[in-house]
């Protein structure tokens, strides 16, 4: 036997060496588990565990927000293999088309990828760019996105790629790559996504591996697997566990034994080979020699498994009890078939790196091939923690796997020991064949597992001793380890049977006072009693019952929020809600359940060996033991019958209290139980809601006047009566004490108008109420007296545009305004001429250190550096401090419904809720024992009248009465007295215009009215006849330059003048007259109230209004006489309830009975409990003004205040962050004159010189071409308030309005009176005499007793202390306008309010005064082709030009009319002689006139061309066309060139408009979509503010942004710091709409925004959190798109600047930034946001 064992050792060593020598070239490159490399087991954001292909497998569910990537070099440090296999097990979301894995180079080129969906794409591009995209392999007709699990293998070899799906489909496609393809590993590998692509992988993945060579892909299907249920299966490579794994490997060359040798059994001792690729601990076996027919009896268990077909559906995992040196045993048939030579590895790991959660389902126990015939036991309950096991000989109990330890180096095989002496036969035989175990309970926490190689005896010798030395050693070590097999708590048991009935409890404590009972029936109306003494201050009473429905009132103000509604029925369990904001830290909870098993810890140091412990108590039965020693082979037995179930086990220790189970379904209704005894009277319930009103009874006949009854309780308010006659004024009563303010009552009817009160202190302005609905139009009332000056109203709704008004007169000069805010930076001016170079100044002193410069632009990306040498491993650092809590992650997918939690602490007693709906009948309770009879309690106080009795018996049906005849109409009633004045009706609809009245009498001559507005300019008059020539006037001032005329015909040659010097710039021209009226603007803000108008004439008497509200309650009447005393009647016994009768008709009110006699005073009773709240007393008189209350809570944000006075200058702020590039600066000041330079070379012809002295007035020149359209000017300042207009005439009285619509039905009426008592029922059987009952609970308050005799009036008590302020009452009706209060002292200037919303566009203001000359604006876009302008005034005579070239001979001109003779002009300077020109054609002879005198200078400046009325294209002056084109013959027949000019002008204008649409200019009228568009159309534009309209369409919603052309055309929107979050506005402060921002994102590729914050303590204590526009939370720790471009916190000074630059455009702009929880009150700590810039 020893020799045989050594043979095995040698054989295994030879096999191992052969395997190593035959290993392929990539043996140095290990297989790569991509999931482990991307840290899937750590469950990063967007990844959570899920069930794999088999219930026990672990897969990972990947959702959209996951961002999983790693450097490629980290996975493939030795380079990416040329030929490789890619294996995965995946289940993708149905309909998905997304990448599973993408590998990028360092330059961002996609080199490798697998895209799932329909079709499946394999992407590959080597260093030469091959294959080209058209040649990329596409597997059409295949889909991996169908929601099912698929095993996918991709084999890449040479020039082809093969796709294997589920071991069934195998498709090969060509892959034309280069001969030596190389993939760059300096980039990144990304799971489930592509850069700048929105499609991401969503689904489950169990395995993703890349293995060098293609064998792994083909052999992945050669392995045989059974179904998940009940057999062996392959564990995926990426889940090392305690289970044996098989992984495909290269087939080593087999050994062939010589034919003459006997086959030798393989050694059962495994050989460890320390092969440690990253992420794997692999144990390899040798390969069995290739032989046939092993001899029975010699065969031992081996590690390979026979090939089986691949699984069809689910596969389950297998847990193998480790045996001594046998990790897997399979049985083969008697024929001794060959176990396959194994092309497999076996991965074996100590401990448990296999994190399995309870939700994955229980792991299934091992089921061997021959145990299939055994009976399957029932599923066991979850076990409790067992006691430490006692290991019997031959048994080894294995706990669940512990954490995975590191693989040790293999030791050399030990020498086989000598067999021990033959011992006595052991008592215990080998265990029998195990039956099918029941389903495991949930796994317990991990125990300790030890694998010890036991010695095997020889197969043929006698049976040796059961316990060998090694086994005894194993038992000792196992006893020290105390294998822990405690499981988690078992499931909750079933509900137990009801316990026996308990004894009756002891009498309880006296209960609290009951709530106020129901309100009694309404008493008769009593006489008005005398004024009583002031009562003690009562508690607020409950609301009274609902009154009779009144007439519909006017719509009231918005009410307070209503009370909560009745509790609804319990709904179904809702979906899991979105993750809420983190709440405040709670109190320490109870100790939680055991957490998940943590990651593998570092191996600890070996401890000293412990002493042998005492023998433990017997444990619970363990799993099936190890297989016993083989006995001599007996004949195969037949299958035995199923064994009987064993005896029940010992009672386990009770488990810990389980969590409450979920609420069960409602059970079926039980049978009706026996009638219980009447229970104790319950506590009085809270007031119920008012009942429905009863039917209105018929009116009764009027009864006789009965004697006056006692004063009853205050009844409900009666219906509104007609106004009675005024009674006698009663005596003034004593002033009562001030009562507490009651709860606010319902809103009463409007009272009559009170007397005018004294002038009150001006109150603070109340909050604006909500806008009420528009009322119906009432009749036009008389004009009222002039109102007082009201406060300035809020900004109204913009009205319709009015008609254009006439031009008003110029307003008087206003007061100087406050200094305005800094204006926006002006446009770039024209560059000035460079000044002469100055002399060199003296050297200045050394300047101070400048501030820190702005961060420069990011430099170009450097080339990737080479790998540095690996440094030595550092010492293990101390554990760092606990970091701050991370941000809440994004919202995860809905988790499974959680278990019901423990019941919470009982809350405080809630207020009495509304009456709930009648619940379903509860199940009958357990019948309690009959209680002892209680003692007879004292007689309770008289209770309230009981509820209405049950209906009486059915009365006899009366005979139907005859229908009465219709009565005659009664006489007309006398006209009633005038009712009180009614409420003012709604204004009626506007009446039709009345007929014109007759001419009135001539009135007195009124005072002179204010000057009327300037009239509109009249039409241009016809030209007057020419006057005589006036005397020559004084030379006029220099006139403005005229518009440039069209180029004239070359003139005759003039004399050459001397060259003039450069002139100075001329003065600014005069302002032009006002332009035509503009389009009517939108309504402006409400102006200041004007002075009160004159008193209007007295109007006609109005019609009677509707009846007014009822008047106030009259004074208290005199006390009536006391009635006679009545005798008290005997109290009768209380009858039993009869059967409920039908509701009878309502009886008449009986007369009040006489007053009873005064009863004797009763004995003084015990002090009662505190009474219930009484009904609400009448409101007391207003108390004195209380002291000022504490400051109230912060109210809602008020409307924006007006702009306050300019505040004092603030302290110097911190340096701001680097802003966007500024606009180009203004030109610098002109430099000093330089020294005289040398004479230059002859220059080109200079420009026209400065204007010369004014020449004589020339003829009108032709109309010039229109100039370019300028930028829109700023709106002028508003004009001053004009003088007050005269009062308007009195309007005619309008017609009566139409009758109103019927009102809505009133509320339901009150409950009817209680019905009569039913008939008395039969007497019940007498009950047993009860015991003395306990003291009863306090009875309901008795009925109101008869009033006592009126006592004498007591002395007035002292004034009570002022009560606390009551609750705020409902808003009262609007009072009259008070007198104006005295002018208060001017308050201090308020803080500057936030900038208000932009106002509506105002009316066109009056023409402003002439402004200062503006800076020269930017060159505007070319304007539309205008019509030809009118002829301008003659310009000043220019300096003499250089001699022109000889012109072309002109055509002969027409003969001109003769001019009047003029005076001879002064002789001009002699010009240079010109070159002789060619002879012109002979002109027609004109009438030669003598030269005329120069005309007088004009007094009136003629309109400049820009001031002429603008002509439309359709109003071209034909006569002007004739003048302007002298070649046109007079008459201008149709079809002449003059007729075409209008057509060409229109075409030109159309062309320019289209050009503006194609090439927008960035103005308000021609906005671009983005700044990128502007840059493309006008690359010469400088950085600055321009108008954009991303959504196109109407340009009214365009907004102004900063265009950063320097950065490539970024569109930048500026934020505004609001109270709760940042909002985004354009350059003028108007908010940018959400739609415009959305379009801006759609038009952009990326966006960036800077955030800066000071380095305060808060910034260092808690991280900055940002909330993006898509509500996602961003932080520098979690987002890869946030870069820190300046860190001022390292130096403890300055600010830190972060830049968010993201392709996920939905994340910007940032809406909130805080160091606290987002959405909480902001703790921004000085956070500043820069503009958000979108790059198109």
From Swiss-Prot:
Residues 258-270 have a biased composition (Polar residues). Residues 994-1003 have a biased composition (Gly residues). Residues 1501-1736 form a propeptide. It is found in: Secreted, Extracellular space, Extracellular matrix. Gene3D superfamilies: 2.60.120.1000, 2.60.120.200. Residues 765-774, 1232-1241, 1287-1296 have a biased composition (Basic and acidic residues). Glycans are attached at residues 1604, 1650. One of its GO terms (biological process) is cartilage development. Its main location: secreted. Keywords: Calcium, Collagen, Disulfide bond, Extracellular matrix, Glycoprotein, Hydroxylation, Metal-binding, Repeat, Secreted, Signal. Residues 1-27 form the signal peptide. Residues 487-1500 are annotated as: Triple-helical region. Residues 399-447, 487-545, 546-587, 1072-1127, 1128-1172, 1444-1499 form the Collagen-like domain. One of its GO terms (cellular component) is extracellular region. Trimers composed of three different chains: alpha 1(XI), alpha 2(XI), and alpha 3(XI). Alpha 3(XI) is a post-translational modification of alpha 1(II). Alpha 1(V) can also be found instead of alpha 3(XI)=1(II). PANTHER family: COLLAGEN ALPHA, COLLAGEN TRIPLE HELIX REPEAT. The C-terminal propeptide, also known as COLFI domain, have crucial roles in tissue growth and repair by controlling both the intracellular assembly of procollagen molecules and the extracellular assembly of collagen fibrils. It binds a calcium ion which is essential for its function. This is Collagen alpha-2(XI) chain. It comes from Bos taurus. The lineage of its organism: Eukaryota, Metazoa, Chordata, Craniata, Vertebrata. The gene is COL11A2.
């Amino acid at each position: 036997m020893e020799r045989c064992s050594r043979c095995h050792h040698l054989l295994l060593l030879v096999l191992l060496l052969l395997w190593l020598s035959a290993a392929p070239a990539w043996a140095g490159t290990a297989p790569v588990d991509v999931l482990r490399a991307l840290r899937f087991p750590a469950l990063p954001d967007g990844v959570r565990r899920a069930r794999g292909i088999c219930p026990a497998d672990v897969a990972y569910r990947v959702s959209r927000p996951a961002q999983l990537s790693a450097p490629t070099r980290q996975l493939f440090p030795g380079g990416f293999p040329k030929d490789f296999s890619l294996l995965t097990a995946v289940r993708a979301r149905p309909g998905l088309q997304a990448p599973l894995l993408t590998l990028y180079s360092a330059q961002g080129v996609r080199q490798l990828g697998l895209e799932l969906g329909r079709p499946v794409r394999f992407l590959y591009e080597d260093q030469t760019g091959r294959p080209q995209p058209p040649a990329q392999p596409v597997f059409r007709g295949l889909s991996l996105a169908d929601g099912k699990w698929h095993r996918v293998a991709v084999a890449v070899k040479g020039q082809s790629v093969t796709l294997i799906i589920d071991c069934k489909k195998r498709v090969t496609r060509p892959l034309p790559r280069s001969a030596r393809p190389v993939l760059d590993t300096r980039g990144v590998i990304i799971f489930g996504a592509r850069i700048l692509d929105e499609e991401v992988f969503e689904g489950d993945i169990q395995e993703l591996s890349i293995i060098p060579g293609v064998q792994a892909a083909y052999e992945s299907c050669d392995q045989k697997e059974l179904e998940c249920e009940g057999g062996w299966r392959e564990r995926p490579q990426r889940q090392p566990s305690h289970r044996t794994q098989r992984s495909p490997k290269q087939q080593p060359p087999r050994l062939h034994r010589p034919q003459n040798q006997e086959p030798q059994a393989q050694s059962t001792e495994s050989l460890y080979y320390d092969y440690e690729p990253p992420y794997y601990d692999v144990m390899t076996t040798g390969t069995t020699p290739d032989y046939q027919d092993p001899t029975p009896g010699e065969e031992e268990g081996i590690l390979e498994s026979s090939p089986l077909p691949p699984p069809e559906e689910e596969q389950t995992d297998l847990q193998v009890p480790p045996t001594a040196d046998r990790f897997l045993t399979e049985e083969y048939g008697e024929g001794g078939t060959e176990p396959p030579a194994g092309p497999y590895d076996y991965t074996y790991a100590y401990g448990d790196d296999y994190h399995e959660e309870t939700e994955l389902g229980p792991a299934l126990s091992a089921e061997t091939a021959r145990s299939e015939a055994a009976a399957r036991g029932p599923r066991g309950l979850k076990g409790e923690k067992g006691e430490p096991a006692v290991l019997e000989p031959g048994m080894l109990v294995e706990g669940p796997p512990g954490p995975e330890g590191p693989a040790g180096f293999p030791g050399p095989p030990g020498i086989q020991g000598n067999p021990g002496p033959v011992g006595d036969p052991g008592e215990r035989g080998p265990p029998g064949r195990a039956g099918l175990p029941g389903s495991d309970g949930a796994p317990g926490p991990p125990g300790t597992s030890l694998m010890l190689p036991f010695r095997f005896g020889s197969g043929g010798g006698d049976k040796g001793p059961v316990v060998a030395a090694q086994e005894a050693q194993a038992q000792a070590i196992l006893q020290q380890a105390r294998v822990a097999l405690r499981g988690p708590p078992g499931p909750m048991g079933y509900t137990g049977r009801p316990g026996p009935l308990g004894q009756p409890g002891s009498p309880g404590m006296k209960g609290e006072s009951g709530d106020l009972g129901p309100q009694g029936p309404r008493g008769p109306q009593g006489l008005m009693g005398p004024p009583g003494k002031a009562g003690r201050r009562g508690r607020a009473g409950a609301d009274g019952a609902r009154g009779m429905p009144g007439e519909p009132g006017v719509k009231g103000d918005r009410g307070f929020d209503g009370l909560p509604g009745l509790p609804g029925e319990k709904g179904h369990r809702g979906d899991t809600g979105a993750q809420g904001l983190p709440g405040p830290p709670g109190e320490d909870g109870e100790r939680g359940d055991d957490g998940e098993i943590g990651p593998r810890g570092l191996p600890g140091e070996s401890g000293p060996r412990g002493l042998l412990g005492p023998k433990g108590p017997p444990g619970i039965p363990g799993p099936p033991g190890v297989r016993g020693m083989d006995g001599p082979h007996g004949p195969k037995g037949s299958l035995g019958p199923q064994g009987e179930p064993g005896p029940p086990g010992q009672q386990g220790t009770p488990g810990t209290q389980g969590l409450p189970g979920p609420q069960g379904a409602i059970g079926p209704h039980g049978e009706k139980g026996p009638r219980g005894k009447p229970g104790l009277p319950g506590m009085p319930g809270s007031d119920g809601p008012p009942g429905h009103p009863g039917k209105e009874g018929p009116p009764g006949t009027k009864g006789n006047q009965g004697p006056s009854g006692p004063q009853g309780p205050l009844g409900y308010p009666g219906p509104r009566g007609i106004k009675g006659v005024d009674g006698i004024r009663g005596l003034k009563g004593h002033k009562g004490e001030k009562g507490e303010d009651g709860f606010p009552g319902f809103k009463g009817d409007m009272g009559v108008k009170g007397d005018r009160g004294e002038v009150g202190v001006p109150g603070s302005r109340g909050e604006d109420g909500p806008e009420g609905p528009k009322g119906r139009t009432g009749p036009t009332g008389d004009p009222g007296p002039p109102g007082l000056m009201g406060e300035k109203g809020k900004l109204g709704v913009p009205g319709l545009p009015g008609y254009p008004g006439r031009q008003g007169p110029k307003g008087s000069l206003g007061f100087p305004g406050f200094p305005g805010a800094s204006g926006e930076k002006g446009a770039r001016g024209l560059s000035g001429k460079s000044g002469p170079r100055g002399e060199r100044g003296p050297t200045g002193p050394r300047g101070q250190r400048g501030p820190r410069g702005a961060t420069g632009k990011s430099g170009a990306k450097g080339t990737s550096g080479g790998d540095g040498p690996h440094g030595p491993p550092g010492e293990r650092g101390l554990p760092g401090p606990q970091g701050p809590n991370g941000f809440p992650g994004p919202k995860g997918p809905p988790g499974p419904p959680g278990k019901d939690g423990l019941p919470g602490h009982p809350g405080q007693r809630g207020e009495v809720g509304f009456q709930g709906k009648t619940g379903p009948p509860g199940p009958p309770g357990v019948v309690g024992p009959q209680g002892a009879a209680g003692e007879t309690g004292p007689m309770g106080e008289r209770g309230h009248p009981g509820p209405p009795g049950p209906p009486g018996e059915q009365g006899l049906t009366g005979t139907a009465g005859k229908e009465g005849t219709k009565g005659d109409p009664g006489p007309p009633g006398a006209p009633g007295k005038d009712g009180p004045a009614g409420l003012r009706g709604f204004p009626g609809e506007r009446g039709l215009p009345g007929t014109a009245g007759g001419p009135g009498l001539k009135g007195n001559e009124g005072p002179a009215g204010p000057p009327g507005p300037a009239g509109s300019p009249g039409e241009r008059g016809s030209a007057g006849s020419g006057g005589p020539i006036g005397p020559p006037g004084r030379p006029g001032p220099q006139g403005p330059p005229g518009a440039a005329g069209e180029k004239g015909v070359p003139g005759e040659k003039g004399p050459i003048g001397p060259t003039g010097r450069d002139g100075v710039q001329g003065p600014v021209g005069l302002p032009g007259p006002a332009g035509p009226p503009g389009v009517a603007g939108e309504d402006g803000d409400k102006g200041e109230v004007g002075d009160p108008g004159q008193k209007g004439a007295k109007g006609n008497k109005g019609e009677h209004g509707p009846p007014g509200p009822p008047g106030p309650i009259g004074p208290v009447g005199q006390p009536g006489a006391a009635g006679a005393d009545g005798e008290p009647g005997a109290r009768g016994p209380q009858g039993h309830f009869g059967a409920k009768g039908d509701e009878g008709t309502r009886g008449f009110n009986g007369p009040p009975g006489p007053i009873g006699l005064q009863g004797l005073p009763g004995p003084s009773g015990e002090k009662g409990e505190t009474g219930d709240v009484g009904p609400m007393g009448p409101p007391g008189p207003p108390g004195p003004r209380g002291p000022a209350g504490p400051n109230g809570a912060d109210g809602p944000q008020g409307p924006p205040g007006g702009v306050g006075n300019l505040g004092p200058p603030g302290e110097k702020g911190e340096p701001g962050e680097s802003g966007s590039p500024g606009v180009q600066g203004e030109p610098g000041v002109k430099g000093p004159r330089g020294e005289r330079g040398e004479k230059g070379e002859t220059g080109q012809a200079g420009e026209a010189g400065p204007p010369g002295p004014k020449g004589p007035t020339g003829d009108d020149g032709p109309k010039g071409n229109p100039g370019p359209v300028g930028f829109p000017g700023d709106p002028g300042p508003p004009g001053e308030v004009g003088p007050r207009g005269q009062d308007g005439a009195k309007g005619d009285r309008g017609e009566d309005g139409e009758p109103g619509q019927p009102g809505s039905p009133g509320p339901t009426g009150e409950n009817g009176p209680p019905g009569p008592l039913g008939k008395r029922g039969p007497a019940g059987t007498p009950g047993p005499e009860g015991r003395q009952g306990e003291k009863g609970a306090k009875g309901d308050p008795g009925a109101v007793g008869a009033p006592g005799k009126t006592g004498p009036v007591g002395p007035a008590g002292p004034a009570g202390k002022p009560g606390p302020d009551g609750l705020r009452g409902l808003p009262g009706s609007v009072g009259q306008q008070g007198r104006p209060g005295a002018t208060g002292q001017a308050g201090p200037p308020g803080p500057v309010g936030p900038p208000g919303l932009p106002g509506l566009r105002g009316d066109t203001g009056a023409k402003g005064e002439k402004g200062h000359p503006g800076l020269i604006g930017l060159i505007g876009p070319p304007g539309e082709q205008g019509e030809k302008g009118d002829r301008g005034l003659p310009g000043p005579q220019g300096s003499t030009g250089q001699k022109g070239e000889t012109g072309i001979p002109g055509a002969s001109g027409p003969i001109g009319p003769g001019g009047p003779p003029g005076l001879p002009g002064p002789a001009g300077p002699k010009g240079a002689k010109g070159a002789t020109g060619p002879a012109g054609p002979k002109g027609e002879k004109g009438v030669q006139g003598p030269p005329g005198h120069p005309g007088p200078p004009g007094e009136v400046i003629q309109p400049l061309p820009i001031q002429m009325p603008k002509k439309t294209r359709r109003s071209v002056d034909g006569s002007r066309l004739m003048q302007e084109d002298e070649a046109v013959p007079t008459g201008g027949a149709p079809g002449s060139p003059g007729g075409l000019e209008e057509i060409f002008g229109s075409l030109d204008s159309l062309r320019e408009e289209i050009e503006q649409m194609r090439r927008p200019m960035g103005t308000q009228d021609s906005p671009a979509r983005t700044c990128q568009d502007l840059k493309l159309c006008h690359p010469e534009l400088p950085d600055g503010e321009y108008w954009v309209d991303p959504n196109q369409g109407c340009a009214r919603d365009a907004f102004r942004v900063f265009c950063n052309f320097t950065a490539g055309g970024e569109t930048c929107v500026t934020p505004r710091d609001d109270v709760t979050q940042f909002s985004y506005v354009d350059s003028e402060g108007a908010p940018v709409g959400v739609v415009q921002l959305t379009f801006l994102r759609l038009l952009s590729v990326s966006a960036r925004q800077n955030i800066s914050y000071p380095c305060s303590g808060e910034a260092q204590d808690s991280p900055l959190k940002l909330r993006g526009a898509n509500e996602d939370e961003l932080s520098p720790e979690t987002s890869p798109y946030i870069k820190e471009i300046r860190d001022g916190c390292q130096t403890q000074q300055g600010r830190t600047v972060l830049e968010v630059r993201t392709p996920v455009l939905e994340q910007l702009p940032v809406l909130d930034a805080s160091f606290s929880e987002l959405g909480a009150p902001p703790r921004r700590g000085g956070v500043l946001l820069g503009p958000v810039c979108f790059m198109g």
